[in-house]
Structure formats: C-alpha cells, structure tokens
C-alpha cells in the first residue's frame, strides 16, 4: 500500500472512531453540533435544539448541552434579538412588525422580542420608512404616478409598515417633489391599491 493509501486509511479509521465515540456519548455529539453552528453565526436556543433533534441527539442530552451553553453565555436569545433588530432595521429597513415575526420564527420568546424591538422608537421607525419612500420615488421618476404609488406602497408593505403610514409618507414625498398635480392624492387613501406589486421580490433571508 502506498504512503497516501496508508494516510487515507488512517484518516478514515480516525473518523470512524470519532463517530463511534459520539454514538456512545450523545452529549459529545450535541456539543459538536452546537459549536459548529455557533462558529458560523449566533443562534437561538430553539435553532440549536432543532439542529440537535435533526442530528438524532436524545432530548435529555440536548437539554443538558443547552443549559450548559446558556450558563456559559454561548446562547443568549436576548442578545441575539437585539443584534437582529439593529442589523435588519438598519440594513433592510424592516419595521417592528416584520422584525417581531422574524424573531418569532427563529424561536425567540415574546418577552425578549418586545424588549428587542423597543430599541426602535416610533420616530425612528417613521424616519426609516420615509427614507425608503424617498429612495423608491427617486428611482421611479418618469414612470406613471399610479405605478410609482403602487410600487412604493408595495415595498413598505413587504417590510411590515401599515398602509396608513405608507400612503401618508408617499403623499408627503410626492407633494415635496411637486408631483401632486399628476395624481389625485386623495386616492392614496383608497384601500384597493395593490400592496404586493408582483414586479418586486419579497424581503427574505434570515441571517444577520
């Protein structure tokens, strides 16, 4: 057998031994799963529990590792939620409503979600929505006014902002740019404007 063949065989044997040890020690397997995921990005307790379940870790071993990692500060759902809110509000302009829904899907408890989204005060949320509208309206100049309204409203709706706020900000931005003569702005209060314009993709993806 060649030197490379011996090295390959030795590596395979070591891997087999490691798998055998993990099978005998489920906590070791649980620890390995959690450390691998946490090395890539922060994770919630629920995300790690789900990963261990998929990896065949017994519930008792998974619970023991979750407690140990939480006590060591490696799992901190409150810190995860705060970082999530700050990151995705500033990078994507998501509203409290959308941020809360995302955190809930990631397994964060309601109390921790409330504390995290309260980082954003109402004025900050409105200011972010206004910047989004200004950017969208600037990028759609020259298009029919009804199209501009629909696209701006759809963009805000997908980010979780309520229609009332969306139409108020669109009205204000259009008035500021002198476009109010091109469209009856009273129509912006009508509920039949398509908020989910199919020309635009939804905001998805759940990584910090």
PLM ranges: what are they?
Residues 1-208:
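An alpha-helical, amphipathic repeat domain used for nucleic-acid recognition
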